[in-house]
């Protein structure tokens, strides 16, 4: 007869390790958390300069983060510019409310404003420069570049915290805007005690003092030459004066 089963023996020696499997798919891009006085905002560490450095050298619309698209100028002055404002043909009205300027509006394939929240978050990450490209109705082109450009958050009314280090061919029409808070047709933050500049001059959101030597978000006029309504159009005073409304303008930023 067969006896009972005995106890199990000792474990054998471990076998050799198997081969490492193939690498998994890449994870999502990392994000930078910017902590402001009122809230914590998450914004991807992506702008057009980073895209340019990664090999994206064709100008066009790119995604900077969830729900945020911008036109990237990959050709002008070394490329890598994030366009925060553009006027081309008057197809998008810029007489908008505070909330619209806060969020941004328009189409990055054409005319648009990137949004004050986005502009603030970008320029708070690192030191940025600003380039303004201008074209009149005769096809002449000028530019203004500022080595330092920074916009404060909403708690400070999107103040133009820093704009300095001018160079270029258009004249320095934004020096008078430094330190001023952003105003819109429904939010009067200017320093003019007699007028609401955003309502009286061009109806566009801007950094008004009393009131401004530039207004790139004013009303879009065609065919009025040097006889446009004063301070109502797309104005760069040091180039074409305050009665001339420009045909095309763009504001673009890049870290340095």
Describe the role of every protein-language-model region.
Residues 1-34:
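Collagenous Gly-X-Y triple-helix motif
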Residues 27-52:
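N-terminal entry motif of extracellular EGF-like repeats
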Residues 43-178:
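Extracellular beta-rich globular recognition domains, centered on the fibrinogen C-terminal
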Residues 47-49, 71-73, 196-198, 210-212, ...:
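Sequence contexts marking disulfide-bonded cysteines in secreted/extracellular proteins
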Residues 79-84, 204-209, 218-222:
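Extracellular/mature segments of secreted proteins
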Residues 144, 156-217:
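Surface-exposed interaction patches
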Residues 229-256:
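C-terminal helix/juxtamembrane-tail motif
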């Amino acid at each position: 007869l067969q006896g009972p089963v005995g106890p199990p023996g000792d474990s054998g020696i471990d076998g050799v390790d198997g081969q490492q499997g193939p690498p998994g798919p890449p994870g999502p891009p990392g994000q930078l958390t910017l902590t402001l006085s009122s809230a914590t905002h998450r914004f991807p560490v992506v702008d057009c300069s980073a895209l340019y450095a990664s090999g994206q050298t064709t100008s066009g619309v790119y995604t900077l983060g969830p729900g945020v698209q911008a036109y990237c100028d990959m050709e002008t002055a070394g490329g890598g510019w994030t366009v925060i404002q553009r006027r081309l043909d008057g197809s998008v009205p810029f007489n908008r409310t505070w909330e619209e300027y806060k969020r941004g509006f328009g189409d990055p394939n054409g005319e648009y404003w990137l949004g004050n929240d986005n502009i603030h978050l970008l320029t708070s990450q690192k030191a940025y420069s600003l380039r303004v490209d201008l074209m009149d109705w005769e096809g002449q082109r000028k530019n203004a570049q500022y080595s330092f450009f920074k916009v404060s958050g909403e708690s400070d009314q999107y103040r133009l915290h820093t704009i300095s280090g001018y160079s270029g061919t258009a004249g320095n029409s934004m020096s008078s805007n430094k330190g001023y808070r952003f105003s819109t047709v429904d939010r009067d933050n200017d320093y003019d005690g007699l007028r609401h500049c955003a309502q009286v001059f061009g109806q566009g959101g801007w950094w008004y003092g009393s009131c401004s030597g530039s207004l790139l978000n004013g009303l879009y006029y065609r065919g009025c030459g040097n006889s446009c309504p004063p301070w109502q159009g797309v104005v760069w005073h040091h180039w074409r004066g305050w009665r001339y409304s420009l045909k095309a303008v763009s504001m673009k930023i890049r870290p340095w």
